[in-house]
């Protein structure tokens, strides 16, 4: 037959992609051939007859000689149909009838007819090897001496063709891998287990870097766990959050070997340290038990948690945590001060800090001692002022030019109300947060109340802050806060009708209109008012705090009425300046006046009532809200009621606030000759004036001499 010819060159028109796919198909055919090769030991166990009939690598040409001669032409026809490639004729040393001929449409039809007839013949004989080729288990293609030169088998690229086993590309490799001593190799890569795959995916997710920095969550967790294992804290879970913050802080602050300042304590931590004292009891053992027994009895500390519960139903009030801390703070206040009654008045909001207000009443005799100390301080100041005035008068006497005294007299100072009466009936303590020290507010004066009505200022939360306003306010923020508390209390402290009543002794001393009554007492026969009646009519609610007059007091005083000392000192002045001393007396509404008599605010009702829950009125509470002072609320349920204020301390005004205008301009000093300006004289006028003065002086001297001579003559006679 001769030597095998060299491999034919590939056609020039074949695209690169086709060459790449064909090369990969050849590599894949080698791998599949190696993977599907049978083990020699297993082949030895099969009987010889079974080995001849079984489909395997040992079988060689199962087609007839005529079929083998026609198969290369079929492959070339299929190759030409798919890719349009034509192969050059190759001289294999066989006769011309066995040489591969160029493929054409006529030859295609002939080959198809011949193949069909051969397949039908084989099917009739029952010896067809077509089913053996379709068998997927280790079927070897037949040996074709002419087809071995066709390196590009088209059946490898068809969709329905089974891949492998294939003829080896290397003619020198004529043995199976198992025959050469290589172990059995499977071409399929084993897939990882689901758990291992999930772990790999989770780790890849944790290794993603953050947007803000180049670190990943995996690295952060490694650093965090390393710190915990190195430090070995007693309770790792409790310090996990702080360690996490420290680890994050170290990302942006590298460790330094120099001295650093200690971190400042956070305000929240400071406040928590101060509030620790509220949750501790002084003493222990039997002493603590005795104190507990004493506290179980009567105590001036109110039940703030019960009040907070009712106001919570009304939709107002503070949180339960803050209410409980306020309760403990007021308990601390009662232990520090001689308090007879105590009540949580409310909370006034501020720009920087807020005020918690406690309304208290001291025991009898305790407040007088403190007032005496305050009076001594004020008297000392007055003495210093008087001494300064005396020194000023002496300086004025020594002065050459005496300034004329002003005729204007300041308006008389209205005295403040005494303790336990009027606007100063109760004492007020304030603090910014529960646990901080309580500060007592001073008594309010009428001038402070009058000026507080003319200004509107936000509170800062610091009592010593000056109040910058016009008209000027006489005091600092502590005095302004006290004045606003007095105004709010007088207008919003209400109670159900019949809860309070006047005593019988005051009934005999009642003045006209009942304006002189300033005290009341609880009615023991009060049974409560149904909730629906409290909501329907405002006449079932009354004011139990005295009204503040325009003068700034609850009880009116005559500002022109003087004491005996003032009358003795100024009798002569009064005679010179006699004027009308009669001033119209101011009268306000009496105590326990119904809310239905309150004046409207620009056609707006001053009060609004509602039920806490309209779906279940039998278990609801009546709630009344002030429209004049937003933030003032009151509730009533049976024999219980309470008032509270939570707001900015400002009165509602339908119009925008306008500050007071400056005072009217005073009259100028009357013009007269003593203040008239004169024109300067000329030189001639000065000389003429001088000559006239000398002449007048000479005339006076002559007259004096003549008078002296006449007197001498009379004496001689």
Curated annotation (Swiss-Prot):
Main location group: cytoplasm
Comp. bias intervals (Acidic residues): 503-513, 564-585, 700-717
Family annotation (Pfam families): Radial_spoke
Keyword tags: Cell projection, Cilium, Cytoplasm, Cytoskeleton, Flagellum
Any one cellular-component term (Gene Ontology): sperm flagellum
GO biological process per UniProt: axoneme assembly; cilium movement; manchette disassembly; sperm flagellum assembly
Location of the protein in the cell: Cytoplasm, Cytoskeleton, Flagellum axoneme
Processing after translation: Phosphorylated by PKA. Phosphorylation increases in capacitated sperm.
Source species, domain of life: Eukaryota
Residue span of region Disordered: 1-65, 503-523, 563-588, 672-717
SS bonds (residue pairs): none
InterPro entries according to UniProt: Radial_spoke
Subunit architecture: Component of the axonemal radial spoke 1 (RS1) and 2 (RS2) complexes, at least composed of spoke head proteins RSPH1, RSPH3, RSPH9 and the cilia-specific component RSPH4A or sperm-specific component RSPH6A, spoke stalk proteins RSPH14, DNAJB13, DYDC1, ROPN1L and NME5, and the RS1 complex-specific anchor protein IQUB. Interacts with RSPH1. Interacts with RSPH3B. Interacts with RSPH4A. Interacts with RSPH9. Interacts with RSPH10B.
Similarity comment text for this entry: Belongs to the flagellar radial spoke RSP4/6 family.
Role this protein plays: Functions as part of radial spoke complexes in the axoneme of sperm flagella that play an important part in motility. The triple radial spokes (RS1, RS2 and RS3) are required to modulate beating of the sperm flagellum.
Alphabetized PANTHER family for the sequence: RADIAL SPOKE HEAD PROTEIN 6 HOMOLOG A, RADIAL SPOKEHEAD-RELATED
Protein name per Swiss-Prot or TrEMBL: Radial spoke head protein 6 homolog A
Gene label: RSPH6A
